Amino acid sequence: MIGFDRPLKPEWIYKTLQLVQPGRKPEEFYEAYNNIAVELTGKDGRRKTRTVLFRTFIYSFQEFTSIIEDNILLSLCKQKDLDYMKPILLAKFIMDYDILRFFTQKFYQIFDSSQEVSSSALTAKMVESYGDTEIIKRSTRSFLRTLCNFKILMPINSAKYHQLPKTALSTKQVRDILKLYALTNHTKQIDIQNLDKSIFAFYKTPDLNAVAKENNTLDWEYISAVDRRLLLLK
């Protein structure tokens, strides 16, 4: 199981993806990342957060890591502003890490939107299911801090968090998350009726059927039946 080793800020991700260029070597941008993530002190902290960033947002789209290849997130970050990209970047974390999908499911099983979030209660549930390992505890801590960085939570103290009001996603953001989901899972078909909704869990999401109809014939063909609602991506 791959753990979520270090908390990241959306600004670090966004600025790095704006900066990197396809066809170049990743190491050409290491120093630039260090200048972006100025809050981090020490080489080890910068290296580990950079590893998570490059693994999730660059290497996951390509077979080899020696040369950066173009991908949907590199393109979007050069076209859209940070606020537009935040939910898309957060969704990519949840798509890529099994432990974060499980975290998200447990989060909403334990807490409703009016409750304070207890890190100890959440960690206990994670350990109960996965086992008492350091990777589980570290991943839980790191993702809670990441959710604070994405303005999903606000820390009250070291163990409790306040849930901030959910931001509403636009239909265009949902469209791009669905396209990202297809690329991440190497598929041209998405059954939105049976889709794992954890990728949208931290935001107010418009009706997926409305999004499907709005983009029908443009980004996909939409097939609606009794037991499934299928997107066939172009």
PLM features per residue range, with description:
Residues 1-94, 105, 117:
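Eukaryotic partner-binding/assembly regions in large regulatory complexes
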Residues 158-232:
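Accessory, usually C-terminal, subdomains that scaffold auxiliary metal cofactors
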Residues 51-56, 140-150, 209-221:
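Basic amphipathic alpha-helical segments that dock to polyanions
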Residues 109-177:
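Conserved binding-pocket/active-site segment within a compact domain
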Residues 26-33, 113-127, 187-200:
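Short acidic, hydrophobic short linear motifs in intrinsically disordered regions
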Residues 34-44, 124-135, 193-206:
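Short helix-coil junctions and helix-kink-helix linkers
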Residues 11-20, 89-116, 170-191, 198:
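Positively charged, polyanion-binding regions of nucleic-acid-associated proteins
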Residues 49, 99, 136-139:
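Short amphipathic alpha-helical segments
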